Amino acid sequence: MDLHMMNCELLATCSALGYLEGDTYHKEPDCLESVKDLIRYLRHEDETRDVRQQLGAAQILQSDLLPILTQHHQDKPLFDAVIRLMVNLTQPALLCFGNLPKEPSFRHHFLQVLTYLQAYKEAFASEKAFGVLSETLYELLQLGWEERQEEDNLLIERILLLVRNILHVPADLDQEKKIDDDASAHDQLLWAIHLSGLDDLLLFLASSSAEEQWSLHVLEIVSLMFRDQNPEQLAGVGQGRLAQERSADFAELEVLRQREMAEKKTRALQRGNRHSRFGGSYIVQGLKSIGERDLIFHKGLHNLRNYSSDLGKQPKKVPKRRQAARELSIQRRSALNVRLFLRDFCSEFLENCYNRLMGSVKDHLLREKAQQHDETYYMWALAFFMAFNRAASFRPGLVSETLSVRTFHFIEQNLTNYYEMMLTDRKEAASWARRMHLALKAYQELLATVNEMDISPDEAVRESSRIIKNNIFYVMEYRELFLALFRKFDERCQPRSFLRDLVETTHLFLKMLERFCRSRGNLVVQNKQKKRRKKKKKVLDQAIVSGNVPSSPEEVEAVWPALAEQLQCCAQNSELSMDSVVPFDAASEVPVEEQRAEAMVRIQDCLLAGQAPQALTLLRSAREVWPEGDVFGSQDISPEEEIQLLKQILSAPLPRQQGPEERGAEEEEEEEEEEEEELQVVQVSEKEFNFLDYLKRFACSTVVRAYVLLLRSYQQNSAHTNHCIVKMLHRLAHDLKMEALLFQLSVFCLFNRLLSDPAAGAYKELVTFAKYILGKFFALAAVNQKAFVELLFWKNTAVVREMTEGYGSLDDRSSSRRAPTWSPEEEAHLRELYLANKDVEGQDVVEAILAHLNTVPRTRKQIIHHLVQMGLADSVKDFQRKGTHIVLWTGDQELELQRLFEEFRDSDDVLGHIMKNITAKRSRARIVDKLLALGLVAERRELYKKRQKKLASSILPNGAESLKDFCQEDLEEEENLPEEDSEEEEEGGSEAEQVQGSLVLSNENLGQSLHQEGFSIPLLWLQNCLIRAADDREEDGCSQAVPLVPLTEENEEAMENEQFQQLLRKLGVRPPASGQETFWRIPAKLSPTQLRRAAASLSQPEEEQKLQPELQPKVPGEQGSDEEHCKEHRAQALRALLLAHKKKAGLASPEEEDAVGKEPLKAAPKKRQLLDSDEEQEEDEGRNRAPELGAPGIQKKKRYQIEDDEDD
């Protein structure tokens, strides 16, 4: 981008900064405002970073900002603004674009910005610029905390950020082309920092306890200073060349010389004796060309050994998603003076700053005061400075802050987190892999430092090492870490350097663990196992489980005399304490008003257990809590009537509520059913550690393949890396006797390349191991000819054992675990039992066989497989467990079902009697479906259990029958809560019908109380929603869950009211699913008819309260007649409204229309008079509400009449 392509305003702003004349910079009067304008322009740049690119192309930093910084730093406002602008201009390109762009156009902009940043870095490599920065920073640090202002802290932070940004710019290797020991741009920058004295200020900030707020900034700058350095090489600078280094260099030169000599010898052998034009062509017998003919070779015979069918072919392009990860970290040797400066800086940092700074940074990380991923700088510093300390002069006290079990735990925790995130966040897998590599390097250095402590002459240091190793080897997670990293190694995300460090760290860990086991004799370690245990449970009635089962009438009569005597004594005691007995559960989710039925059951349980005083006390307490309806007796009840009431409670067949585990079970699944639950239990135990058993965990193909992958680059690997590879493979092949794990064709190709390498003499250890494996293979191939085929596959331990010990050896070893064979007598008995039980309906054939099989114990699976082997069954699928498939109905069974239906169709519980008397036991849902299919019933509601009418008792107004009906009603209200959408349609349909069956009776008191609390408008809104949903479902023909969205504040408050939510549940409205939904929903299983009935049940006497003064007569005799007259009108109106909804749903019969159609007309005139006398506002409101209900013209009158009825 050229200067003349700049934006006009941007160009004018840059020109207004000033100009450079010689070495002097002359600033313009409005220089400060121009700098602020540039900051504003950068704040509003587009996604291509156009402003940044134009300023970079104009070299604004080199030509204007740096001269202003160095020559006009006394102008504090201008200096602050220039620092702000520089921090913005030098921020990393990745930070500007968010990530590395993939589109070519944005990638071009990214590279252009990076080029300008590299130019900025070169411009900053001057002592003068860093001298001004260090001088300003020094003056600011001289101020005490009470003198330092907020602007001073901001300037300190901006200077540190500017240094960080400049050091962060990556080097341009293609342009610099610097060799080792030559000064690169980064080296020049470090030398400028050293000459300006900024390094001393960094050491001061790191060591001062008063400057802890800059800890992370300092650590980030230090990590960028040593980015390309090797700590071990840096520690040996200035001490002369060690003998070990000289020998390593000599070995490397010897390898290069041998390869060069081999190439010369090969070229000499390739020269033919004859002239090339008389070479001729050759036919290679036994090697076919593309056709069926022999191959024709047109080159000299000395080139025949290099022939390949792939010659001349284009190599197959590897897809981008399958390419191996590239190495990003590059290590190089800086100039000698820079390395000496860095070595001294490291020494001072370790002695004065390391422990304090690392402790402060760790505190920031644990308290979450740092930014995201700042722990990577902590792990880099740990690995680098501990390695430097170990290589320079090992002093454990200098790194004591990070030399503890807690540090091991912190690194292991982050390493595991990065490993899991790399597997889940596939888009950022490469970034997570780099962080995981840093954590692995830190873990490796921790182990190396502990290993170095073992050979320390100080006894206290060796004891500390022993304690750390004891803790590390004891915990299972530390031992399993390397196995997990090997098994999930992915070369597409993790570079080869990660695999190298993983192999070296594993080698060090195994060496330390093996040595520790030998010195201890026996080592006890922690062991964690996830065990699955199966728990069987039966869906039983709670009363049967508790043992309090209501007895037969004869047994009740036998028990009653003893209870009556106790009750006579207790009833006379009017001072019987009721304080200690609470008839309801205050912690239950069920409201207190709905716990009356449960209180009745508790009274019966006390009587069955012989606890008469407790039963009487509970009865009196319940009377105090629930006085309405005189269910537990009236307030002035006599002792004799109390005893008779308790006798009725004892003999009443009270329905019992299911336990909390079975409360959500459907009514169709009331039959007993065994369910198996698999529970994972993590058991922590201790066991004696066996090193060979632990080593066997590495004997798998995934680990071996990772080692072989690294071995392929043996020429580029260091001698230590190759030693680590060979040592692990030798452990598997020799110590575990599993050399067959390496019997693989790609491994043998690698061995062939190694043995034919001219410099094979430098890899004596690798050559020896390759010859050992090849010798083992050929020895096995002489016995097992199939070993050549096995070369094509990677193998596990089971295949290895079969290869070496013979195929089928695993079956012989596991013969003791096999089930015993079947004798002819057992087979005959099995055949007999199967034929006897296979046609029995409602019975599991295999379970019946297991119950009558008196031979050797067998499992269900063994019996099923043997039945299939004997030909008695076609497949294992024929023996599914009970309830997994539908048994077909036979003709006789259908006739029996029709006969039972005709016999019990007039009873109160048709379905219950059929289920008790039918021969072939089936579930309730199957019987209902069959009755519908046969046409015996038209709808499911015809099979519902009919409510029994309350009969007056001769003793009390509420007798035993009323008690039974009352309890049954409350239990149905509690059990008929709407279930989730995932239930079956047949279950949801029957439950919805049960809800509608008790809507009017259960909602009467609840709706009245809601009206009294001021929820009239939300109730009308809910009524309209139900009717609209019913209309939509009739028009569309399909139904789906409809959310109830409260748009007004009143409706929203009502939806949060517990009593209003209770009404919604009773109407069948489903609450929002946890974490997935927000609003209540009208379920899809409710039909339009059911929705209209629910809407009709919501009408309450809202207007009747205003009309009540006009309806109250002055004469008592007239009052009774008017009340009877009003009740008659209300009943007639209710029947008319229900008929209107039935007609709309198509359910009304002509007889009903004739019977009901005449009666509302008689009641209409009087109601019309009442309505006409109402206020005009209420009349208009009624007219507006009538169309919403979708009724005929008299809908308004009907609703008022229904509200009057429910008010009574």
UniProtKB/Swiss-Prot annotation:
Q: Annotated region Required for nuclear localization: where?
A: 1182-1199
Q: Which GO terms describe its cellular component?
A: chromatin; nucleoplasm; nucleus; replication fork protection complex; site of double-strand break
Q: State the taxonomy lineage.
A: Eukaryota, Metazoa, Chordata, Craniata, Vertebrata
Chief place of localization:
nucleus
Which pathological condition is tied to this protein?
Advanced sleep phase syndrome, familial, 4: An autosomal dominant disorder characterized by very early sleep onset and offset. Individuals are 'morning larks' with a 4 hours advance of the sleep, temperature and melatonin rhythms.
The Acidic residues compositionally biased stretches are: 664-679, 971-990, 1172-1181
* Originating species: Homo sapiens
| Residues that bear Phosphothreonine | T1089
Region spans: Disordered: 655-679, 971-994, 1091-1131, 1143-1208
Please state, per the UniProt record, what induces or represses the expression of this protein: Regulated by the cell cycle. High levels in S, G(2) and M phases, with highest level in S phase. Low expression in G(0) and G(1) phases.
The protein in question is named Protein timeless homolog
Q: Where is this region: Interaction with PARP1?
A: 1000-1098
Record's keyword annotation contains DNA repair: yes
Output one GO BP term: replication fork processing
Write out the similarity annotation. Answer: Belongs to the timeless family.
> What keywords would UniProt list here?
Biological rhythms, Cell cycle, Cell division, Chromosome, Developmental protein, Disease variant, DNA damage, DNA repair, Mitosis, Nucleus, Phosphoprotein, Transcription, Transcription regulation
Domain of life per record: Eukaryota
